[in-house]
């Protein structure tokens, strides 16, 4: 747990280092450390399955992109069910784009929240600033990559939520050129 705390703090503080992107591999390592911390806080509450298509771990993505989605799945999806649940992180190529999915078996999101999110507004119903991490990820993708890339949320109340990020396929070695 100490290693996970130190690694998470170190990586989070590096956000201001001028690099806005990191590899999928590093992003998954940060997310794993975050999950270690949450498993300590909430033992036996959630399971996580990660599936990353072969050859995609060197793709570049915005820093601290997966962790806020996983955090949201735990805190706003799984925990309110008062039962254990599962979270999937799935990374694959679809139609020439990088697709990152975070899916949970949580309580789901209301249609009103989904509508507000699609309109670019806050998902929080009472301006409590819940879901700020999800909104931050959405806004950073729009800023960094423009039209054709972004975030979609699919949800059924009582069944769970799937967040789908669509990103360009950029390799780490391409950035170094």
Give a label for each model feature.
Residues 161-170:
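Short C-terminal beta-strand
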Residues 92, 173-176:
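Gram-positive cell-envelope targeting signals
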Residues 1-154, 162:
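Two-component histidine phosphotransfer core
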């Amino acid at each position: 747990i100490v290693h996970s705390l130190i690694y998470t703090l170190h990586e989070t503080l590096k956000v201001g280092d001028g690099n806005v992107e990191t590899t999928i591999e590093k992003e998954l390592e940060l997310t794993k450390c975050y999950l270690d911390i949450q498993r300590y806080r909430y033992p036996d509450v959630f399971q996580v399955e990660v599936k990353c298509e072969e050859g995609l771990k060197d793709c570049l993505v915005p820093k601290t992109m997966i962790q806020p989605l996983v955090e949201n799945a735990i805190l706003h999806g799984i925990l309110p069910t008062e039962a254990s649940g599962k979270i999937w992180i799935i990374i694959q190529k679809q139609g020439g784009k990088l697709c990152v999915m975070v899916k949970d078996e949580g309580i789901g999101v209301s249609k009103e929240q989904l509508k507000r999110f699609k309109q670019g507004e806050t998902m929080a119903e009472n301006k409590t600033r819940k879901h700020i991490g999800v909104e931050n990820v959405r806004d950073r993708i729009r800023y960094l990559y423009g039209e054709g890339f972004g975030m979609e949320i699919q949800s059924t109340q009582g069944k769970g939520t799937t967040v789908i990020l669509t990103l360009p396929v950029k390799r780490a070695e391409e950035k170094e050129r």
